[in-house]
């Protein structure tokens, strides 16, 4: 009888350990605009340093083209290029319905037409019966393919540090209690400060240090809650940032064309979408082609390497500025920063959206947890690769995507190594129990 009970107990312990591995949770952070070199000074960033020492850091993360936010939000969570998932810009226009997508702020931006081009990870998880909590994540408030996450703290402009730390605490509690299988937190301040003051400004350095303090708190909370062996933490950004000399490097379209011949213009900056009147198309194309510091593409001429031209909402003419240059209709229509006490100054000193291979557009990727190697430096990866990493940590089969497993496999602990470590810990637990230590 005693031997039978021992066998049953042994089986129970081993099953418990297997269940523990199966119940590993995932916490992801989308840090908007966090350039690849923002954490180069790890000596003075102890929060980031601990994650790097305990986990994986890639050399850099190449965004999808255009190196803008919404296209890359979706590439990160679908593993697909923009022309595949159809989220091709922060500002889009549908010629059939005349609807506009305006960086997610207007009611029409929640229409399924913009989002249903591909299935993001959180939708797949919900379909599989898993639970997802999301905090300020753009798109979590949208019904995509008929599905919404279990919980969504809707996006607000530039969430505060308190919003961030509160979200961390709430997310960890939801994951530990199994209310959530994955939690995602979006943080915008790095992007906002980079735009306003530039990527090398004192303001961006302060924002980075503030974020580092939040990650120090996160690391401490994970230890206090005894979650180091049960949670994978992944941090990534959507793009980088480059210095912008406001008003000095401006391409004014009305110097080359009559804007009344344009049916629709969407966005300004590094990438501008134009829909000229049909009878003026060739004239406008030829005139814009004479402009310096800018490439003009008919839709079918857009370089294949951009993985962009087959997008449903791509315009008939796409303008792409050289790095550091800014395309607009006219200087006079640009806003200025003015606090009422000083001379009006440049509205923005940093920008992104340029050719995705431009070095300043590179983003960041860090990860730590039981499924990742420790103190490991990996080579460059691409935005579309991140999805496969997330699926791997969740034990899910990824949907067809454009990512490369070969670029990210090196950062993962092998299944055998993970299983071996788990088995050793479980056997040790069993030994302690049998000897009466616990």
UniProtKB/Swiss-Prot annotation:
Q: Where in the cell is it found?
A: Cell membrane
> At which positions is Zn(2+) 1 bound?
32, 69, 238-239
Q: Which reaction does it catalyse?
A: sn-glycerol 3-phosphocholine + H2O = phosphocholine + glycerol + H(+); a 1-acyl-sn-glycero-3-phosphocholine + H2O = a 1-acyl-sn-glycerol + phosphocholine + H(+); a 1-O-alkyl-sn-glycero-3-phosphocholine + H2O = a 1-O-alkyl-sn-glycerol + phosphocholine + H(+); 1-dodecanoyl-sn-glycero-3-phosphocholine + H2O = 1-dodecanoyl-sn-glycerol + phosphocholine + H(+)
List required co-factors: Zn(2+)
- Keyword match Transport: no
GO molecular function terms here? glycerophosphocholine cholinephosphodiesterase activity; glycerophosphodiester phosphodiesterase activity; metal ion binding; phosphoric diester hydrolase activity
Write down the EC number: 3.1.4.-, 3.1.4.38
User: Cross-referenced Pfam families, in alphabetical order?
Assistant: Phosphodiest (PF01663)
Q: Write out the residues that bind substrate.
A: 32, 69, 90, 191, 239, 352
Q: Which residues carry this modification: Phosphoserine?
A: 69
List the active site: 69
- Coarse class of the protein's main subcellular location: membrane
Lipid-modified residues of type GPI-anchor amidated serine are 415
Q: Which residues form a coiled coil?
A: 162-226
Xref: InterPro entries: Alkaline_phosphatase_core_sf, Phosphodiest/P_Trfase
Q: Using the chain's own numbering, where are the disulfide bonds?
A: 140-152
Broadest EC class assigned to this enzyme? hydrolase
Biological process terms from the Gene Ontology for this record are: choline metabolic process; lipid catabolic process; lipid metabolic process
Sugar-bearing residues? 163, 258, 287, 339, 402
Q: What does this protein do?
A: Choline-specific glycerophosphodiesterase that hydrolyzes glycerophosphocholine (GPC) and lysophosphatidylcholine (LPC) and contributes to supplying choline to the cells. Has a preference for LPC with short (12:0 and 14:0) or polyunsaturated (18:2 and 20:4) fatty acids. In vitro, hydrolyzes only choline-containing lysophospholipids, such as sphingosylphosphorylcholine (SPC), platelet-activating factor (PAF) and lysoPAF, but not other lysophospholipids.
Q: Which family does it belong to?
A: Belongs to the nucleotide pyrophosphatase/phosphodiesterase family.
Its name, as the record gives it, is Glycerophosphocholine cholinephosphodiesterase ENPP6
